[in-house]
Amino acid sequence: MTIIIGMTYVILLFILLLSPGISIPITTVWALNITGTQGPDILYGTPADDNIRDHGAEDMIFGLEGKDQISGDRGNDAIHGDVGNDTIRGDGGYDSIFGNDGNDTLSGGFDNDTLTGGSGIDNFNCGRGSNDTVTDYNQVENETKLGNCENF
């Protein structure tokens, strides 16, 4: 199993001196393009807007904060968006997709997937020819179902 942690990103640390004895640290975080391996992976994003893509096997992906673009590719994946307005695609495999906080777009892709939006106004796109399940669809939150979603 491969663990790829995007939190090993580069941080620029500046110290702004206001007056003697008072300082404020300022940090800058850059988004990452994170690509998994053919084997099972655990992939972590950063607090920035990341692009995370896996290439197969059964993986766990955590976008963390930011407006992330996440693709599970092949394999039965567990994908978590976390805080931010994420776009998450399961693609192939029987995936469990969690948007968590934010206004997310969740797409199951092929096979039978489980889509859970979390808080926020979420869009669900169930895969063509699949039997996806949406576990928290709520019209009161003005959520939108797209595509072939049938199971709520």
Residue map of PLM features:
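Glycine-centered beta-turn/loop sites at beta-strand termini
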Residues: 36, 45, 54-55, 63, ...
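Leucine-rich solenoid repeat scaffolds
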Residues: 116-152
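Bacterial N-terminal signal peptides
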Residues: 9-22
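Extended, small-residue-rich solenoid/repeat segments and analogous flexible loops
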Residues: 20-46, 51-53
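Long alpha-helical scaffolds
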Residues: 31, 56, 65, 135-136, ...
